[in-house]
């Protein structure tokens, strides 16, 4: 899953702005943006956040304070109603802390022919399966459509756009959603695919994209809310499958500390403890 970036030339996408919206773990969002920037030259890169000042300047990344983003509802409202005024390119690549460009060589110029592309959702009819907003390419047409008062329900914004209002967006706004085959080539979220994709979304895929020392350090930036989530448990399983038991143990410790002590979590903790003597722990990271 990890491309060889030493031999892969950077892709130039002057038509695309890269952005993330994050006030919970902006430091991780900034690192995810940097990982995408390592493979692609974008027209502009922006981190929308609130009340956060990076410890060191972020080279090539604009940081814009957008006021409080306290919930998923606030996130959806900004992406639909606030983001459009900040985007001046034909397209924007919307990402989150747990998704980034995976293989720039998998980019297809045909992606720009569509108004919305995101990783397909599983167990959905083809007509509403595209797709996830956590790593999604959106056109100006889509952004402007999101401002229409006809969109009354905003959250979750990707499901509202791609399921609830999709027919209306297609018929009244002329929005073109990418077909499944194009979306599968663009990104994945729920399950990894055998062929290369441009990007991905989902914390449970991180062990295949990052080394253990980096992942171990990333855990320190995540809020308790994450450790209580189903995604955290899926990440623990992925860490064990990737033979990263030390990082899995730390994640599960934080999960139990956050109040999640169900049998499955305790079982995963026991498995991690059994595996640790057989695999090297990650290097220590300075506070």
Where are these regions (language model features)?
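Alpha-helical linker/edge segments of TPR/alpha-solenoid repeat scaffolds
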Residues: 273-287
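Short beta-strand-to-loop acidic/aromatic patch adjacent to the donor-nucleotide binding site
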Residues: 89-100
């Amino acid at each position: 899953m990890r491309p060889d970036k030493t031999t892969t030339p950077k892709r130039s996408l002057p038509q695309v702005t890269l952005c993330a919206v994050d006030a919970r773990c902006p430091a991780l969002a900034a690192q995810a943006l940097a990982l995408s920037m390592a493979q692609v030259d974008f027209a502009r890169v922006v981190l929308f956040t609130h009340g956060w000042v990076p410890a060191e300047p972020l080279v090539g990344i604009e940081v814009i304070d957008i006021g409080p983003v306290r919930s998923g509802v606030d996130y959806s409202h900004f992406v639909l109603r606030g983001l459009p005024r900040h985007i001046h390119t034909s397209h924007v690549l919307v990402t989150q802390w747990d998704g980034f460009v995976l293989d720039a060589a998998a980019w297809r110029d045909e992606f720009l022919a569509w108004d919305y592309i995101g990783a397909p959702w599983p167990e959905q009819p083809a007509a509403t399966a595209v797709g996830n907003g956590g790593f999604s390419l959106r056109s100006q047409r889509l952004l402007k459509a999101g401002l229409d008062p006809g969109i009354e329900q905003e959250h979750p914004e990707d499901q509202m756009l791609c399921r609830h209002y999709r027919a209306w967006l297609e018929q009244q706004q002329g929005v073109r959603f990418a077909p499944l085959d194009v979306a599968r080539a663009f990104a994945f979220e729920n399950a990894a695919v055998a062929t290369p994709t441009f990007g991905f979304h989902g914390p449970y895929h991180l062990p295949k994209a990052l080394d253990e020392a980096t992942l171990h350090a990333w855990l320190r930036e995540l809020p308790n809310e994450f450790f209580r989530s189903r995604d955290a448990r899926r990440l623990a399983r992925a860490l064990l499958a990737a033979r990263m038991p030390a990082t899995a143990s730390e994640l599960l410790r934080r999960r139990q500390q956050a109040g999640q002590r169900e049998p499955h979590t305790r079982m995963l903790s026991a498995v991690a403890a059994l595996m640790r003597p057989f695999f090297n722990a990650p290097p220590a990271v300075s506070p």
